[in-house]
Amino acid sequence: MDWFLLLKGLILGIVEGLTEFLPISSTGHLILVSDLLNFNDEKGKVFTIVIQLGAILAVCWEYRVKLRHVVTDIGSRQDANRFVLNLLIAFLPAAILGLLFIKTIKQYLFHPVPVALAFIVGGLLILWAERRPHVVDVERVEDMDWKHALKVGLAQCLALIPGTSRSGATIIGGLFFGLSRKAATEFSFFLAIPVMFAATFYDLYKNRDILHLDDASVFAIGFVASFISALLAVRGLLRFVSQHDFSVFAWYRIGFGIIVLITAYSGMVQWSG
């Protein structure tokens, strides 16, 4: 058994779980950390896809009561029907663009320097958004209409650029379009479920020949680590947004992006790409 490989799996699982639902880009962090750990070959890339399932299930577990009510009330309650329709509307823009451009995006942007630039730009956008007057039109996720959902879905398209952050794009987009912090954050969590399930299973299907039973242990460790750390991150973020804005994440993104650029151009770290 390769204990160092298991350690890599544990580290990446924790990174995925902690960053997936924070506005700091899990994809960007996984690209950078995988590069540092020299786990960026084809198997490593499939691994980073598989461990996303742990993070998705963490959200499903945290909101299991609400999701169960939605499933059982579809067709009989208007609020459940509207909730599902809003998720579908918000899901479609990024899904369509992703299918059209994902190969090009992975070829040119899944590298440390483009990710670092996206970190910085995303951080600046968060600071700008936080300094705008915030007019709240929607206090609860249940009060959203299809127009709010479509706007958040269009904002999510920015997250196709690695380093941008899916949660960052949807949460800040939600704030920009009149959602309260709690509503924007929760809708981002719910929207992650169809988006990440679709992206994960699509990538797994495309790379099914790379998966082997010999890798089950490292994949399992990464999956469990992702689930536990994501559950903690989701609960922590909900408490955080009730009392703070997102500026701290913006400064983290900017600082981290600058460090990556400095290490890349100074030769301190031999990043790939």
Swiss-Prot record:
Q: What reactions does this protein catalyze?
A: di-trans,octa-cis-undecaprenyl diphosphate + H2O = di-trans,octa-cis-undecaprenyl phosphate + phosphate + H(+)
Its BP terms in the Gene Ontology are: cell wall organization; peptidoglycan biosynthetic process; regulation of cell shape; response to antibiotic
The subcellular localization recorded is: Cell inner membrane
Q: Which GO terms describe its cellular component?
A: plasma membrane
Regions that span the bilayer: 4-24, 43-63, 83-103, 109-129, 184-204, 218-238, 248-268
Which cysteines pair up through disulfides? They are none
UniProt xrefs under InterPro entries = UppP
EC assignment: the record states: 3.6.1.27
Q: How does it sit in the membrane?
A: Multi-pass membrane protein
Catalytic EC class: hydrolase
Q: Which GO terms describe its molecular function?
A: undecaprenyl-diphosphatase activity
Keywords on record: Antibiotic resistance, Cell inner membrane, Cell membrane, Cell shape, Cell wall biogenesis/degradation, Hydrolase, Membrane, Peptidoglycan synthesis, Transmembrane, Transmembrane helix
Q: What else is known?
A: Bacitracin is thought to be involved in the inhibition of peptidoglycan synthesis by sequestering undecaprenyl diphosphate, thereby reducing the pool of lipid carrier available.
Function description: Catalyzes the dephosphorylation of undecaprenyl diphosphate (UPP). Confers resistance to bacitracin.
Q: Which family does it belong to?
A: Belongs to the UppP family.
Q: What is this protein called?
A: Undecaprenyl-diphosphatase
Q: Which organism does this record belong to?
A: Nitrosospira multiformis (strain ATCC 25196 / NCIMB 11849 / C 71)
